[in-house]
Amino acid sequence: MGEVQREKVAVIIGPTAVGKTKLSIDLAKALNGEIISGDSMQIYRTMDIGTAKVTKEEMDGIPHYMVDIKNPEESFSVAEFQERVRKHIREITERGKLPIIVGGTGLYIQSVLFDYQFTDDAGDAIYREQMEKLALERGVEYVHKKLQEVDPESAERIHANNVRRVIRALEIFHTTGEKMSDQLEKQENELLYDVSLIGLTMDREMLYDRINLRVDIMMDQGLLEEVEGLYNRGIRDCQSIQAIGYKEIYDYFEDRVSLEEAVSQLKTNSRRYAKRQLTWFRNKMDVTWFDVTDGEKTSEILRYIEGKLQLKSNNSK
């Protein structure tokens, strides 16, 4: 018997503000595709401006999945993301369409494409509570430092402010004696799909200028009011609020910083995040990069995907 044909998937990754959204919609139109968000924060309802969520107008009739599926107070795991996205890939393929994953959350996207296994082990609730208490009493940096001591690779990948993931990585080491990063490395080798994985990059100074401008536009669009709505609903200490764009403005509402300082910190954190994204993608995934410093490369990228996945676009003769 011949080899089972794997489902075709196009993936667009890259740092924040590089232009992934517009490209994905152009490609979906040309390739008869439907889009799956690979962003761990666009899943949350009412968190639109700070996550740079694709608007109905931008979607231009192209179906989008993994957007607005959770309330801000709900938690969400990479295992749940993996399960839901694989189901969407199957269903989109069955409809004769091309699944296009677009986003910047590297671990989430990687968990879908490769043969990652997530255990159903509930972990150690007592240990978890101890770590949560430590984070409250000694600060998140203290707990992050503990992770650096036992699993430096995960500590590098997981930001100190992402307390839940820091504690989860510590919990895995505590319960299994294995580093989370080692568990993932062991499962990283085999692609489950026929994948065209492309990345967008650009001159760093230009990217940073775009990020700064994007933050200014977000403020003009009403980011302050969006975050105030969440704050007034009593949403605290949730996974969603640890997102860049929300935690900084929360500091303002809690009188820890001025609004000017909050916006400045938001720009700094966004630039740092973009740098971490690029480092992660370059170290962890076999990406074909397209430099869009001098303008979009839609036609070139389209030709590349057609060749890699042996597709014909609507633009082809």
UniProtKB/Swiss-Prot annotation:
InterPro entries given in the database record: Dimethylallyltransferase, IPT, P-loop_NTPase
Main enzyme class: transferase
BP-aspect Gene Ontology terms: tRNA modification
EC number of the protein: 2.5.1.75
An annotated Gene Ontology molecular function: ATP binding
Pfam families in UniProt: IPPT (PF01715)
Residues binding ATP: 14-21
Gene3D superfamilies found in the cross-reference section: 1.10.20.140, P-loop containing nucleotide triphosphate hydrolases (3.40.50.300)
Keywords: ATP-binding, Magnesium, Nucleotide-binding, Transferase, tRNA processing
Residue numbers marked as site, Interaction with substrate tRNA: 105, 128
Cofactor (UniProt): Mg(2+)
Region (Interaction with substrate tRNA): 39-42
Reactions it catalyzes: adenosine(37) in tRNA + dimethylallyl diphosphate = N(6)-dimethylallyladenosine(37) in tRNA + diphosphate
Job of this protein: Catalyzes the transfer of a dimethylallyl group onto the adenine at position 37 in tRNAs that read codons beginning with uridine, leading to the formation of N6-(dimethylallyl)adenosine (i(6)A).
Subunit record text: Monomer.
Annotated family: Belongs to the IPP transferase family.
Protein's UniProt name: tRNA dimethylallyltransferase
Organism: Bacillus cereus (strain Q1)
Classification of source organism: Bacteria, Bacillati, Bacillota, Bacilli, Bacillales
Gene it is expressed from: miaA
